[in-house]
């Protein structure tokens, strides 16, 4: 017999990418034809080595999603009201938000966006702000003798030959790099 979520329910699930537990809250449940159909799920800004305890419910906060190109907003979506295997009910508390969403998902999620957001929050704030600013910028920079937008996301040394990997700092949004040869300072991290 399937277990259905109720508004206010808080669930924990093991996030295999984080190797920790994460949590979500059901903020509302919609019925269709007299049956629970959709649960609105809100990701919570919580992670731990063991499942959340009922005593911790009062301290929970929503997880805002703003990693990379996302504009800051609540990380929430609608999915089936049937609670999937692996999700453990911790308790029930008043929904943390009253907003609704028009985002739908085919399942409760595997925690990938939560993982990406929590990893994003580990990046120093100065770097995150530089990324966000560059992503929206029309500014250009000179690189390898050519002019490029500072928001450049990918680069290949096949088309843009350069000597020193430190030159890549010109592109705060660079997230894909294809190299065919060794470049000076490739392993320097700062």
Please state what every model-predicted region is:
Residues 47-190:
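Intrinsically disordered, low-complexity, charged/polar segments
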Residues 2-15:
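Short coil-to-beta transition motif at edge beta-strands of beta-rich domains
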Residues 19-20, 35:
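Short acidic/glycine-enriched loop/turn segments that link adjacent beta-strands
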Residues 20-30:
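Short beta-strand-centered aromatic/proline hotspots
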Residues 32-43:
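Short, solvent-exposed secondary-structure boundary/capping segments
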Residues 13-16, 29, 189:
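A generic structural motif
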């Amino acid at each position: 017999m399937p277990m259905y979520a109720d508004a206010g329910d808080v669930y924990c699930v093991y996030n295999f990418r984080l190797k920790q537990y994460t949590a979500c809250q059901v903020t509302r449940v919609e019925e269709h034809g007299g049956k629970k159909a959709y649960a609105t799920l809100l990701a919570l800004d919580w992670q731990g080595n063991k499942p959340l305890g009922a005593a911790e419910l009062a301290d929970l906060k929503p997880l805002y999603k703003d990693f990379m190109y996302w504009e800051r907003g609540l990380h929430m979506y609608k999915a089936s009201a049937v609670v999937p295997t692996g999700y453990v009910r911790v308790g029930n508390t008043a929904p943390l938000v009253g907003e609704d969403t028009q985002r739908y998902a085919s399942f409760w999620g595997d925690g990938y966006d939560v993982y990406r957001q929590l990893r994003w929050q580990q990046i120093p704030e100065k770097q995150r702000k530089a990324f966000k600013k560059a992503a929206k910028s029309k500014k250009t920079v000179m690189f390898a003798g050519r002019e490029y937008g500072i928001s450049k996301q990918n680069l290949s040394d096949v088309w843009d030959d350069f000597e020193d990997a430190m030159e890549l700092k010109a592109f705060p949004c660079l997230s894909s790099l294809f190299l065919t040869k060794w470049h000076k300072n490739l392993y320097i991290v700062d």
